[in-house]
Regions:
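Extreme N-terminal basic, low-complexity initiation segments
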Residues: 2-12, 16-18
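Intrinsically disordered, low-complexity serine/threonine-rich segments
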Residues: 11, 18-19, 41-44, 48, ...
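Short, low-complexity intrinsically disordered segments enriched in A/P/G/S/L with frequent Arg
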Residues: 13-14, 22-27
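Short, Lys/Arg-enriched N-terminal segments with co-localized hydrophobic residues
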Residues: 31-36, 40-60
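Hydrophobic alpha-helical segments within soluble ligand-binding/sensing domains
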Residues: 172-175
Length: 251
């Protein structure tokens, strides 16, 4: 008890010269009269830092997936059924990325976008099984249906026209049908790219969607592909309603 009383009596002494009895003790620590008050602004700074850190983490967890539907193989590149692939390739060009990672039964790319992650996917399953690839990637990266945007061909629209939808049925499109079946949901936004109707009701549908465009149709399609790419990105940034107002209709 003597030591503590003597230290208290000499609290103004130099920390290296505190007398104990007849001698001088080299203090192992700096003695302070009373604890320093913790400045309030430090607490505010630390609080703001962790709130900012948490918000940043939350933003990074918001993932999007854009899917372009089509068939693999060079023989299908310019067919009507591959309009979705052409549109997603255009998105990749705009974002300066390559869709070249082979996984999830598809080719995909990953890019940081608007504070989160964006995945671009080209299923390699052929059109009618596209949902398998979509399900695998979306499940792995935890992308909900509401943030899966699908680009695909629509024979009910003339070349050069786009139509955006928040959700809905497959409408006779086997690729969309497969996605709905695999996800167990039809609540995902989509961008329909007009490729023209069959020239005659008796014309075989498979033959029609696997045919190529005429020169005149191709001329109308090229700007529509560019607008479809912009429309998909706009859905992410502004929502489906704003994107539909901007991009539905003529290219």
């Amino acid at each position: 008890m003597d030591i503590y009383r003597k230290q208290s009596d000499q609290m103004d002494a130099h920390p290296s010269e505190i007398n104990v009895g007849d001698g001088t003790m080299a203090a192992p620590y700096i003695y302070i009269k009373k604890p320093l008050a913790f400045p309030a602004f430090y607490a505010i700074f630390i609080l703001k830092y962790y709130v900012h850190k948490d918000n940043t983490t939350m933003k990074e967890q918001v993932n999007w997936l854009i899917v372009g539907l089509g068939n693999p193989g060079r023989e299908y590149e310019k067919t009507r059924h591959n309009a979705g692939w052409r549109a997603i390739d255009r998105i990749a060009e705009k974002l300066n990325v390559k869709i070249d990672k082979l996984k999830f039964q598809g080719l995909y790319a990953q890019v940081n976008y608007e504070g989160g992650k964006l995945f671009l996917l080209k299923p390699q399953t052929y059109m009618n099984l596209s949902g398998r690839s979509v399900l695998q990637l979306s499940a792995f990266f935890k992308v909900p249906p509401a943030r899966i945007i699908v680009l695909f061909d629509d024979i009910s629209l003339e070349p050069g026209r786009l139509r955006l939808r928040k959700d809905g049925s497959a409408g006779g499109h086997n690729g969309i049908k497969s996605i709905i079946q695999e996800l167990g949901s039809q609540d995902f936004p989509r961008v329909k790219i007009g490729v023209g109707a069959k020239p005659h009701p008796d014309y075989d549908l498979a033959d029609w969607v696997l045919s190529t465009f005429t020169a005149q149709e191709e001329k109308a399609l090229v700007p529509a592909i560019d607008r479809a790419a912009d429309a998909a990105l706009c859905i992410m940034e502004k929502g489906i309603a704003e994107a539909s107002n901007r991009y539905s209709g003529k290219a």
